[in-house]
Amino acid sequence: MNCRCGLLAVLITVVTPAFTPTIFAQEQGEPEIEEIHVWGRSLQLLGIANSASQGVVGYDDFSTRPIARVAELVEVIPGMIATQHSGPGKANQYFLRGFNLDHGSDFSTYFDGMPVNWRTHAHAQGYMDLNFIIPELVERLDFQKGPYFADTGDFSLAGSNRMKTYDSLEEGFSELTLGLEEEIRFLTADSFEVGDGILLYALEHHQTNGFFDLDQDVRKYNGILKYTGDIGNIPSRITFSAYDSVWVSTNQVPERAVQSGLIDRFGFIDPDLGGESYRYSLTGMFELSDWDLNLYASSYYMSLINNPTYMLNNPINGDEFEQEDERILLGGSLSNEVETEIFGIPVTRNIGTDMRYDNVSELNLFNTVGRKRFKSLREDEAEELSIGAFADLEFSLTDQLRATLGVRFDYYDFEIEALRPGNSGGDNDSLWQPKVSLAYSLNENFELYANYGQGFHSNDVRVAVNTIDPATGDPSASMDALVKGKGNEIGFRYDTLEGFNFTIARFELDLDSELMFVGDAGTTEPGLPSRRDGIELASFWEINEPLAFDFSVSKTDGHFRGLPSGENAIPDAHDLVAAAGLTYHVPNGWTTSLRVRHFSDAVLTEDESVKKSSSTLLHFGVSYEQDSWELGLDVLNLLDREDDDIAYWFESRLLSEGVAVEDVHFHPSNQRAVRLLLKYKL
C-alpha cells in the first residue's frame, strides 16, 4: 500500500497543485471566445427523453455547486441523497424513491462506460464507491429512473446514471483547498495535443483529520490520464485512472452512550475502525462504423475494519471484524443504433450486448482485535460471469406519438470456492425483462409519458450456493441469485425553450426481495418483498443571464408486502426528500451559490415505534475570478445544524454493560466546515 501511495505522491509533487470547484472545458485549440453558461438541466429533452424522470446534468450545474464529498455529485439527480455512516474512504449511503439504497443496491453508476457497483462484495451487495472520481473532470451526468430502459441491467431498479469526463480542458489549472481540521486538497489538470489527438491528465491529493474526536487521518491519491483521438482511423477514448486511499473511521454510535455522557456526538467506541482501498482502471470507447464498442478492466482492493455491535457476540475480545475484497474486473459492451422503417413507420432501432466477469480472489471475513486477525469466519473465492443482450424499437407513429418496445435478457454463471466445503459450488440463473414506453407531444412545449418495465438486482451469489452459516455452523437455506422487480410511471415535461422546465412523475415499484442492512452483521442481506409508490417534481429556471434556480421534491410511500398494516414499514427509508439551489454566476467575476437539502424523518422499525429525525442542511459558496486567478470560499452546513446523516435500530453491548441493549445508532452530519479555495489557470 505504501508503494502505491508513494508513486502517486511523486507524480503529484512534480506539478503545481491547488483546488477550486470551477471547471473549464471547451475544445482545445478553439479561438478564445466569451465564456457562456451551459446548464445541463436546461438542455432540450422534448422529443428525446422516454420518461418524465429522465434527465441530464452537467457543465455549470457541477462547477457552481459546493459539495462536502465526492458522492454528493449524484445529488444533482432530483430526489437523490448521499450521506455517510462511517469513514470518508468507504462508499456512501444513498437514498432515492423511498429506498435506503445502502451503498448502492438498486442504483447503478457507470463512469466513462465502466460499471462502478461491485457485486458479491465483501461489505455490501452493489457497493458503489465513488471516491476514485475527481469531480472537476465530470463533464456530464445522464440519469434515468425505474426499470424502463433496455440498455441498463443489474442494480438499476430505482435508477442509474452515466458519468462522462471531459475530453479536453479549455485551460489547464492548479488548485489548492485549505479547510479546518488540517484539511488540504491539491489538484492539477491540463490537456494538450498529442499527434492527431488530445491527452488530458489530472492528479489529486487529499488529506484531512476530520471533525470527529478520533482523527480520520485520510490520505487519498487520485490520477487520471485520458487520450481522445483516432487510433487507426477509429475515433477512440482511452482512459486510465488510479485511486489509492487509507483512512480511520468513526462509525455510527449508540444514542445511550451520548446521553449518558460517555462520549459526545462526534465521539467513538472502538478506535481501531477504518480501512484502505485502491482501484486501478483502464477503459476504452471506440466508434466502429455503425457500432459503439466499450471495453474496461479494473484491479480493486478493499480492507474494512468494522464493529457495529462492540461486545455483543464476544464479551471478551469484542465483535470487531475485517472484511477483505480483492478482484479483477473485465468486461465490455457493443451497441448499434440505426434509423429504419417497419411497414412504412419510421423506427429507431437500438440493439446491443454486454459482458462482465468478476474474478474475486479474496472475499474474506475475519474476527479482529486491534486490527489483528485472530479468527477466520469465511475465506471465499468467487467467479461471476454475466452476459446481457437488449433490443428496443422506437416507433414514430405520428408527428406527436412515439412508442418504444424493448426487451432485455441477462444470464449469470457463478462459482464459489469456500473455506468451508459445504459452501462451495456453482450455479447459473437468467431472466427476461420486457419494457414499454409511450411519449405524446401536445405541442412544442409539453410532452406526456407512460412507462412500464421489469428489471432486477443480483444477490451476493454466495446466498445461492451456501448450505451452512459460517458464523454459527447452522444449516442455511439458499436463495435466488437474481431478484425481479417491476415498475410503472406516468408523467409530463414542460419546457418553455427559453430557460425554464418542469417535470412531474408518478411511479410505482414492486420488488420480489428487498436488500436490507443488518446491523449486527455489518452487511446487507436479502429481505422481504416490497412496494413503493410516489410522486416527484423537478424544475429548473434560468431566470436571466447570471441567475439560475432549481428545485426538486419527492414523496414516497413504501411498505413490505405480505405483512399486516402496522408491522410492514420499511426501516431507514425517508418518504420525503427536497432540494433547492440559487446560483449567481458572472464570467470573469463573482459566482455565488446557496443550496438547501432536506430529508424527512424515517421509521427505524417495521412497527414504526422508533423513528429518526429529519435533516435540513444549507451550503453556501462564493468565488471571485480575475484574469488567471480565482479565490473561493465554501461554507458547508452553514447553520451548523446538529442533524444525523443516518440512524439504525439494533442491539449492541458496551464494555460496561452486562446484557445486550436495543438502541438507535446514529452518525452525525458534518459540523459547519469552512474551505478556502485558490486556483491558478496555467
Task: Give the residues covered by each predicted segment.
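Extracytoplasmic beta-strand/coil segments of soluble accessory domains associated
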Residues: 39, 71-118
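Short acidic/polar hinge/loop motifs at secondary-structure boundaries
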Residues: 115-145, 164, 479
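Short strand-turn segments of transmembrane beta-barrel domains in outer membranes
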Residues: 142-150, 159-192, 211, 481, ...
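Transmembrane beta-barrel wall of Gram-negative outer-membrane proteins
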Residues: 173, 178-207, 212-250, 273-285, ...
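Membrane-embedded beta-barrel scaffold of Gram-negative outer-membrane proteins
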Residues: 188, 285-288, 292-308, 441, ...
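Face-selective signature of the C-terminal outer-membrane beta-barrel domain
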Residues: 230-243, 275-419, 439-441, 500-504, ...
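Gram-negative outer-membrane beta-barrel transporters
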Residues: 336-338, 343, 396-399, 403, ...
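C-terminal beta-signal and adjacent terminal beta-strands/loops
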Residues: 549, 601, 623-682
